[in-house]
Amino acid sequence: MTSVLQFDKVTYYYQSGEQKVSILEKADCSFEPGKLYTIVGPSGSGKTTTLTLAGALEAPKEGRVLFQGKDLKDIGYTNYRNRHVAIVFQAYNLLEYLNPLQNVLAAMEITKNEIPNKKQRAEELLLCMGLTKEQMRRRIQKLSGGEQQRVAIARALGTNADIILADEPTGNLDADTAQGIVEIFQELAHKDGKCVIAVTHSQDFAAQADVVVELKRHKLQQRREQNV
């Protein structure tokens, strides 16, 4: 199957004082549609930075990140972010003056993708995340951390992007809710054909991915595909 996202000899580093700290060194990795990937590795190894490169929030120092075979520089970083990728980071970046339903609808309005029946779809996503209709209309500040995380995930899913990126999406959730998130990601990949890439420390989550990508020695190493 053709890759939807590809790292082609990507090198990335940052400066810490006079020291250059390497994250990736000529790293290659391909991600296909219709699969759930997890990225694993030690704390501080650069897993979140890898997501920022995949989401065009950072650019490689060397090498290329490709979407459907085209360099993101040629597609345009803003166009790529607005149309093709949705990101859930640990800092949820929710609009606190809006309620959960309005947050999801706001993301739907910003995306360049066509989304029919926006309000109905937004409500369905929030219900799938375990929020009640009453909670959908609460101010964000009145929700727990776990509830806010679910809203952030629903907001990303509502954009109908080709690629879903998530940084520790089950980190603040109880076991049952976390499993529900994993199953939603699996459905997005297997039924909707999305490419879902999640950073996780959870062995349970990683075990349920189609492919595990390990960040090791500044390379992205794909383990063999798992039978899930």
Predicted regions and their residues:
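Conserved ABC ATPase "signature" region
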Residues: 117-134
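Conserved ABC ATPase signature
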Residues: 139-143, 147-149
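Conserved ABC transporter NBD signature motif
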Residues: 63-72
